[in-house]
Amino acid sequence: MYEILLLPPAQKDLDKLEAQAFARIIRKIRALREDARPPGSLKLTGEDGHRLRAGDHRILYRIDDAHRRVYIYRIKHRKDAYS
């Protein structure tokens, strides 16, 4: 099982979401505890990170397998996620 760490920029992103998107993203984040590389997640090109779709939003995170931690660093709308 992985420990989930929500970094301050991701917490700010999460705080701005409407209730429905918030609930969907929290479900996805909780699922990362069991599987840090779930089906549908992708390794980011040119970065040390992964992305996971949650409706119109993307959860951007890094995996530390040595310490069994997932660092969530951003939660962005898909149009803003990669800029």
Predicted segments, located by residue:
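A short, surface-exposed loop/turn module that caps and links secondary-structure elements
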Residues: K28-R53
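Enriched for short, Lys/Arg-rich terminal
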Residues: M1-A23, R53-A54, R62-S83
